[in-house]
Amino acid sequence: MEKQWSFPGVLPENQIQNRQIRMQTTKGEIVFELFDKEAPKTVSNFVYLTKGGFYDGLTFHRVVPGFVIQGGDPNGTGTGGPGYRFEDEPVKRAYDRGIVAMANAGPNTNGSQFFIMLQDTPLDPLYTVFGKVTKGMDVVDQIRVGDVMSSVIVEARAK
């Protein structure tokens, strides 16, 4: 039976503060810090899904050279998610190279899909920013459609 996911709300601070994501991909390792103070709901959601193994084995289903790579859809088509949606959080940063943000289908439709910016881009503030790549931008640049996230874990942020 397929696992049922439900939105966790904001997790306790000790589960989301000073955390980073370590993602093993077909092309190598990507590490990104999480902005728990700016986007606690979104960080809680990403931590919850990651700890549950949601992202393990999923692919990057969308790559726009010079713009973004996108993943987090269990269907691999850009239409799937965890089975729930949650509200946007105010965007407090520009969409610069390495920024990690939620992909959505309109206001308050966040789920599991996320994207990583390949270059600084002036986007409207419609996509909740919740992290930034700290290691592996060379790997991000090599990601192509179909590349796999083989392992995604949450860990204490490197000092």
Regions found by a protein language model. Give the residues of each.
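Cyclophilin-like peptidyl-prolyl cis-trans isomerases
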Residues: 1-159
